[in-house]
Amino acid sequence: MEKVILGRTGLEVTKLALGGLFLSELGGAFEDSKHATLKALELGINYIDTAPAYYDSEKVLGKILQEWEGPLVISTKLGGRPQPFDPQSKKALIQSVEMSLEYLHRDSIDILMIHEPDRVREYNWWTDELNYEGPVLEAIDEMKKAGMIKFSGLGGTTAHELARVCDSGKFDVVLTAYNYSLLWREAQYEIFQAAKRHHMGVVCGSPLQQGALAVRYDDAINHGAPWISEPRREQFRALYRLLDETGMGIVEMAIRFVISNPSVDCVLTGSSN
């Protein structure tokens, strides 16, 4: 399994990594999550991402990892816990990481990301939205000094605003989801450049666009799905023609496309079908 250095962290991670959203109860039975996770680790994957907002993903992952003794990089996030969640409470943020450490059975978190730092209506992280200042930065600094976390990051879903937070230069890694894939490429215009300016590691989530690129939808594209615009339909048709010409499956092509971009260090794939 090919490995890269994740930006300025110096961490060596596999280009292909495991996303933890559907390790949770959303993904089905525990045994299925366990099988998928341990199989991924046995095949060489050494990086898994999770979050408190992913239901019971941290607890499930922690339980699974009791059966794994190999090296592993884990990222988790701040956001959504404890309830009622107050992103302006440094005490609550530190408490959330203490819970993550307990659930994951870890002494420290390799990468702690701020979840949705680019969506103020989701989580009001900042007291100064122009310079990206707030108690969350104080909490991160304290936890680094205490050895609770090693590196900090951003996990977001916008393209323009997330790039602006990257340009603050205050974070080591950026995880962008839904913004870079075969047919959605907004991240390449701003996020990748901002990350490069600050030597950040770049992680791309959902290369299959949460299912849009997991299987072919020929009938829907050609005869149904009235909510899809004609330009988008033509994109899908062109993609399907390319698949026919190359004989490659859509999942393989989708992951190969993202992972081959030199601006991308690591690609997260889900654990469920």
Regions found by a protein language model. Give the residues of each.
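N-terminal binding-site loop/beta-alpha segment at the start of enzyme catalytic domains
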Residues: 1-76
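Short amphipathic alpha-helices and their capping/turn segments at secondary-structure boundaries
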Residues: 1-9, 61-67, 93-104, 189-200
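Beta/alpha (TIM)-barrel catalytic core signal, keyed to glycine-rich beta->alpha loops juxtaposed to Asp/Glu
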Residues: 3, 117-273
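Conserved, mostly hydrophobic/aromatic
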Residues: 6, 18, 40, 48, ...
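Active-site mouth loops of central-metabolism enzymes
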Residues: 19-31, 78-94, 123-129
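Short, acidic/polar
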Residues: 27-40, 86-105, 157-164, 254
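Structural motif corresponding to the early beta-alpha repeats
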Residues: 67, 71-91, 114-118
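Active-site groove signature of glycoside hydrolases
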Residues: 101-125
